[in-house]
């Protein structure tokens, strides 16, 4: 199947040159890394990032921090496993798919072999295109990857995993199988957990709540991520993808983590009465 973008022209520009200008703006912005990716790194081990998925004007500079780090630690052919929450309610509880996704920068091919192995080895994961047709949380990550590809930093395929079902056991199962398949196929991988943090709360309250779960991520404590999201009623839409990513990264040997940047929508709108939190984190 070929999937067409559904939020191009809304969350990010639909036209090539306008999108390139926006991506460069995200990197050079004061809330971004303040420099463009300029050279490929050397891939030595899997990387995991937490990346936001709001409109680029709000969260793009925060996301750019993670992609800058990816650019410094990859080379050659990379499979990007992208986990995102299912906001639409369409399709299966947890699902991948095979085929191609279109972007304004060109097509992104799915690593069909990896997706097929996930489906065969994970009982709770379906092969379901409907889960992905209208969902934006994975789509908004792709232009950043295609931009790195256009800079000749790496060549990407990807695997989309949409998660409507985010109970702890399911997230752990997904993370376990991602790591297992990556080892068995000997893939060079990055794992991207797409999430925003607190939604529509006052700045002070949102930042305090988000600090709790960010601490859990930095400690690679997947169980505490789930517990604190529930206990502190943190309106983080993609905690399941984050838990699955952390589990997979730990199984693949990750031991270190970094908070690259935290910001809120209030830093753009200057309205701090109801903000959305965005964070970029690196695990390796």
Curated annotation (Swiss-Prot):
InterPro entries: MEMO1_fam (IPR002737). It comes from Methanococcus maripaludis (strain DSM 14266 / JCM 13030 / NBRC 101832 / S2 / LL). This is MEMO1 family protein MMP1387. It holds the Pfam family Memo. HAMAP family: MEMO1. Belongs to the MEMO1 family. CDD domains: MEMO_like.
């Amino acid at each position: 199947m070929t999937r067409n973008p559904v939020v191009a022209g809304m969350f990010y520009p639909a036209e090539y040159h306008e999108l390139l200008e926006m991506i460069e703006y995200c990197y050079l912005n004061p809330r971004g890394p303040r420099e463009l990716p300029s050279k490929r790194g050397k891939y030595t081990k899997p990387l995991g990032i937490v990346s936001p998925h709001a409109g680029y004007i709000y969260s793009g500079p925060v996301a750019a921090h993670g992609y800058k780090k990816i650019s410094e630690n990859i080379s050659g052919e990379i499979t990007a496993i992208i986990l995102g929450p299912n906001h639409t309610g369409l399709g299966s509880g947890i699902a991948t798919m095979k085929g191609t996704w279109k972007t304004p920068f060109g097509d992104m091919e799915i690593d069909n072999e990896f997706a097929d192995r996930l489906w065969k080895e994970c009982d709770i994961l379906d092969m379901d295109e409907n889960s992905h047709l209208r969902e934006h949380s994975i789509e908004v990550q792709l232009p950043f990857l295609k931009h790195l590809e256009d800079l000749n930093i790496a060549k990407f395929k990807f695997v989309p995993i949409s998660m409507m079902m985010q109970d702890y056991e399911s997230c752990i199962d997904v993370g376990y199988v991602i790591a297992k398949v990556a080892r068995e196929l000997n893939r060079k991988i990055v794992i991207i957990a797409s999430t925003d943090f607190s939604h529509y709360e006052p700045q002070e309250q949102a930042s305090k709540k988000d600090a709790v779960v960010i601490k859990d991520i930095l400690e690679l404590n997947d169980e505490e991520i789930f517990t604190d999201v529930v206990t502190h009623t943190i309106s983080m839409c993609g905690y399941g993808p984050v838990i699955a990513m952390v589990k997979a990264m730990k199984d693949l040997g990750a031991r270190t983590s970094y908070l690259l940047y935290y910001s809120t929508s209030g830093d753009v709108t200057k309205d701090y009465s109801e903000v959305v939190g965005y964070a970029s984190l690196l695990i390796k």
